[in-house]
């Protein structure tokens, strides 16, 4: 090590300085997370027009490699603003771009071995691709288009099934997608399908509390006597009489908190104490506790899916592949540096070139940061007609009007930070 430091301390030529400059610029340029910090401040302050202006500016000055993230964030801002149709247009564009990016570019992969993962076009984590359809389903449900919403729900479930069975990934289906499927099917009076979706959501997240009400009611209605008896014994406090002819339901979906953010951490890849940096998800605070009031009913929203937990699971499945790529990258850079040293007949220059090349070997910390940490749900049985829903979270209170017809299920989607 002392010998190496002496080599590095010697004066170098302009070529080395030029190489250093290029590598440093490559490592630092185009940090999407940093460039959109102001956008996130506006978004979390519910200044949605300001967030959209900021995203447009980032899009104009930014790189194509961040194009998917711009679309995802824009679609989510429009969704939070209640611009359901506009959000779906952007999300559809994001879905199409994501599909195109899934075709791996050989030149891009090779380039990442010399520079770093941040120089590739962002393709999205597996769960982020699934969330495109979840957001679209909620948009369609708010627009009253149950069939289009169910298409998106089925797409989530089918994609997850493919990931598990064909790609051998240790994922589970998303409870929020199955629960939303139950809500939509119940609204369509497809009782058996609604029961199946509610039952699957309960299997994935057994801590649903009062949200098991439709599962109790529909298990009895569809003649699943053994299931009904077991549920009734477990939840004796949950009333579940049949719906009256003039009765309706309101389901409130609260997208709560901030999705976790990627941060670098070091992993040991061998017995020599050598460390490689990889990304891990770190929480950005806790999701707020949410209370929902409708008339004289007051419910605490129940967490159906922790997206923070899903994100960590999905990223953890990629760590092995990341380490392998990093090792391959180190090997390629060592070869390039050795070649440079041989060509210039300077061992010192080769060593410095390797250090400079490897200094840019940073993990990709980009992610879809406008997503929530959790999906929380509250539901109510109410007379048909117009109702005001009051949502309280983190000291912020908002009111939302929903009009629901007899026998139907009204949906209210709210974003809270």
Regions found by a protein language model. Give the residues of each.
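Short loop/turn and low-complexity linker motifs enriched in small/turn-promoting residues
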Residues: 225-417
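Boundary/linker segments of alpha-helical solenoid repeat arrays
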Residues: 63-67, 98-109, 161-170, 202-230
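Bacterial Sec signal peptide processing site at the extreme N-terminus
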Residues: 24-48, 57-61
